[in-house]
Amino acid sequence: MTRGPVRLDVAISYALPRAGLPAAVSFRKWVAAALKGRIREADLAIRVVDAKEGQSLNRHYRGKDYATNVLSFPADVPEGLPKGVKFPLLGDLVICAPVVAREADEQGKALNAHYAHLTVHGVLHLLGWDHEDDKEAEAMEQLEREILAELGIADPYAGER
C-alpha cells in the first residue's frame, strides 16, 4: 500500500450533452478515492457516451452487441521500457450514460451514487481487479464497498444476495 498524495491526471470527455451528468470534479474525486493507498501516480481518460457508441465499443472489444454501463481499457506497458522508469498511464474508462441512468432508476439508486460506483468499479479493473469467479467478485465488491463508504455512499450491493 502506498502513502501520500496521488498525482492524478484525469482527462474527461462527454460525447453527449452534459445536463444531468456528473461534473468532471466528481469523476476526479471518485478516481482519487479508488486509487488512494494503491498507486501514487496515474493518468487516465474517462469518456461518457451515448447508447450507440457504448454498444459499438462493447460489440467491437467484447463481442457483445449491447451497450453496457462501464468498459475498462487498461493501458499496456510499452515493451522495452527500462526498469525503474515510471509508466503512470492506467488506461481508459467508457461510461454509457443512458445505461447508468436506466440502472439507477431500476435499482432505486441515486444517479450520482451509481456513477461513483461504476467509476470506482472501472478504475479497479484498470488496476487489475476482476470478477470472473465468485471469490474474485466478492473481494472486488468488498473493496468497492470500502471505497464508496469513504465517499459517504451506501453499499451498492445491499439486498442483491
From Swiss-Prot:
PROSITE patterns assigned to the protein according to its UniProt record, in alphabetical order: UPF0054
InterPro entries noted in UniProt: MetalPrtase_cat_dom_sf_prd, YbeY, YbeY_CS
EC number: 3.1.-.-
Cellular component terms (Gene Ontology): cytoplasm
Key words, A-Z: Cytoplasm, Endonuclease, Hydrolase, Metal-binding, Nuclease, Ribosome biogenesis, rRNA processing, Zinc
Cofactor binding: number and manner: Binds 1 zinc ion.
Location(s) in or outside the cell: Cytoplasm
Protein origin, superkingdom: Bacteria
GO MF assignments: metalloendopeptidase activity; RNA endonuclease activity; zinc ion binding
Entry's Gene Ontology BP terms: rRNA processing
Positions annotated to bind Zn(2+): 121, 125, 131
Coiled coil residues, start to end: none
Cofactor: Zn(2+)
NCBIfam families (UniProt xref): rRNA maturation RNase YbeY (TIGR00043)
Free-text function comment from the UniProt entry: Single strand-specific metallo-endoribonuclease involved in late-stage 70S ribosome quality control and in maturation of the 3' terminus of the 16S rRNA.
Stated family: Belongs to the endoribonuclease YbeY family.
Protein name: Endoribonuclease YbeY
